[in-house]
Amino acid sequence: MNLRKTVEELDQKYHDRKVVMVDGNDNELGSCGLIEAHRDSGVKHRAFSLQLYRLVGDKKELLLQQRAVEKPVFPFYWANTCCYNLAPGEMYLPRAVSRVKEEMGVVVDESVLRELYKFSYCSPDIEGWCENELDNVIVGE
């Protein structure tokens, strides 16, 4: 049984959702639809990956999540705490705070978050889907 959503189902769900197209230096080039950004070889777009951790004694525990079936790319995979494709006008840290609350119910203050680095990658999935992102890695406790 294939639980993965069809292109038509995803297009209906994300029809109005836009992402920010960028070059390799995070300069804005415009916007495009979320589905367009993830089909075939994808369109380079702005994203963040948030990794939350907590100290337990002398060890750090990472908060992971399993990606939802509604995700166009890599549904059901285990991943970082939260990741997201930014829409036009959204800023990295404020959107990371609001998105982790929406997705995980976790309340985080922006002051505990740090932007570590950005990297660009392209990772094809099965069935014609692809992540093609300039990803800002954010960590917090």
Where would I find each of the regions flagged by the language model?
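Short, contiguous pre-domain boundary segments
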Residues: 2-4
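A glycine-rich, hydrophobic loop/mini-helix early in the fold
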Residues: 42, 46-86
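Active-site segment of metal-dependent pyrophosphate-handling enzymes
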Residues: 67-70, 103-141
